[in-house]
Amino acid sequence: MKYEVLTKDGRAKSARMETVHGIIETPVFMNVGTVGAIKGAVSTDDLREIGTQVELSNTYHLHVRTGDRLIKQFGGLHKFMNWDRPILTDSGGFQVFSLAKLRRIREEGVQFNSHIDGRKIFMGPEESMQIQSNLGSTIAMAFDECPPSRASDQYIRDSVDRTTRWLLRCKEEMARLNALPDTVNREQLLFGINQGGVVDEIRIEHARTIREMNLDGYAIGGLAVGESHEEMYHILDVTVPHLPEDKPVYLMGVGTPVNILEAVDRGVDFFDCVYPSRNGRHGYVYTNQGKLNLFNQQYELDSRPIEEGCGCPACRSYSRAYIRHLLKAKEMLGMRLCTLHNLYFYNTMMKEIREAIRERRYAGYKASKLAGMEGPPKG
């Protein structure tokens, strides 16, 4: 892996990352395909058409449904889903702690019940790395605990210490797996995760600890889980400066276009969030003038595209009125078109961000973008 910062504009940075599955230009928004597909009937051909650089899939869900061992028999997730660009897999940790019925956290890992059939499953650092190795993703995430944002300082500190020990085990297991002859991707990369709730001291200490581990990248987890936007931005302000400047920084699970604009200004490279697809399936679409709800009656006779000048498949061919009709009729095409538009909007915004940073005009771009999106609601 080679990561090179091309341009800095204040704390915002535009970088180029070379991986075994292709080049990633940052800042980048990863399109979330939990089980190897974007919800809303979006194919990998669609993703290529709308400019997606990185797809993100979920280790936990792929493990409990189809099974990572089966996917390995197909040559890994890339071949299984016919995607030739980078894939990031999360560790499964967040789902273990938030979706499944937690039985017990031990030093070895976590035992829990599957949310599908109730069977007992054990997952620890080694198991998470083994599953992600079977999937053969470009980037694997370390197994961590995401403590509740309002947990006590002592609980957060104990959790972070355990996450650090788990990270060391993840690194050792990945090194072992990448040396095996039958490993799907022997150049799989490992990102560690910074935790610490909204406690400055713990965040900083943990960032300083994991930056010494010489990982391929560093994520900031445990945000967008109930804290205010101001708290999120503050944690980025105090944490990012303590992570290596020559490695990518990933803000997990974030977020809205406004969140992304603010986080880029604080040195973040990678983003992911389900908002574009989830909102699209419910008729909410993003524009440069704010978010629209196409279910609203005001669009019943609206012959305009979702956004004038947008190059997405929905805006090239269909009116707001027609898409509203599809949504009201519960036709899958309506959800698909809204999802494609939203993902295209995000991908295009990231391209504009990269260009603005490279031309050292990010402050002006951000101000202009925010002025449009934070104006009066458009319905």
Segments from the language model and where they lie:
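C-terminal extensions of enzymes
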Residues: 1-18, 24-33, 40-41, 144-150, ...
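Non-catalytic, usually N-terminal nucleic-acid engagement modules in DNA/RNA processing proteins
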Residues: 1-184, 297-300
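Conserved, mostly hydrophobic/aromatic
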Residues: 22, 55, 90, 132, ...
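Hydrophobic alpha-helical packing residues
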Residues: 22, 163-170, 210, 239, ...
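Short, solvent-exposed loop/turn segments at secondary-structure junctions
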Residues: 31, 61-63, 94-95, 147-148, ...
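A non-catalytic, amphipathic alpha-helix used as a structural packing/dimerization or gating element
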Residues: 127, 131, 158-169, 205, ...
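Glycine- and acidic
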Residues: 148-152, 157, 217-223, 332-335
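Glycine-rich phosphate/ribose-binding loops and adjacent secondary-structure elements
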Residues: 164, 173, 177-179, 185, ...
